[in-house]
Amino acid sequence: MSSTLDVKLNRIDRIFHPHEIVQGQVIISSPKGFSHQGLAMKVEGSARMQLSTKGAGLFESFYNNVAPLELVYFHLPVAPAGKVPPGITKFPFEFELQGNDGQELLETYHGVYVSVKYEIVCDCIRGIMKNKLHKTLEFVVEVPLREPLLDSPEEFHITPESLENVRPSLSAMPYFHITGKVHRTNCPVNLPFTGEIIIEEAKSPIKSVELQLIRVESVAHADGVVRDATEIQNVQIGWGDVCRQMAIPIYMIFPRLFTCPTMLTPAFKVEFETNIVVLFENGNMITENFPITLYR
């Protein structure tokens, strides 16, 4: 059995806020023990960006590399050179979570063209003939607002006359009248997105009613800004030719890590939208778009 190194934090969910104290242990398990040249830890956090090939083109996205935004970077000595005895040995550590030189921390986010990650990297250098022990552990940073935003509910009415960007071939589609409301367009990221939709009237049979969550990521580069929208998730809230004049609940949980509070920085933006989509059996589809602001 070979020696192993692991990093454990004092919080199971590994969620921390700016300026909190992060505590944990480096745990080394060794059947025979060994000598080492020190136990070192590195804490790093950065926002990494890349250009969309669709928005910037394949050539531009390959050669216009966008430098990452460094948020946190420091080294932390855990133990000096010495010996690890046989069995399990634990080395405690702690540090304050704060940005470099007054840099504000951004919330953890795993996107397509923008990602914000925070990691603890721990290395134990052993003798010349032995491989070093290495462990990388990601932890999550949440950045709450001091005051909540107003809910800003919004009602909607959809008829053939209210549609925009309609192909000429669909201008004579059968009549429909759809109403509804969303309870918040300023949404706490830890609460569900809710509302209701009512099919007041529809001459054509309906196939499904769906709710889409969209991320809109914008990345600045030397020649301008590349903006790209991608789907995070799609929730079916109605199946088949749904009943007319009956409220269909809108309910969607914002997925952890793949969503975050709306971020607007000089280097990039991460924004969110929801689409209510009604798909008819004849293949026609209508979409109502709601830009939303997420906050914690």
Features from the language model and the residues they span:
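C-terminal beta-sandwich interaction modules and adjacent acidic
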Residues: M1-R296
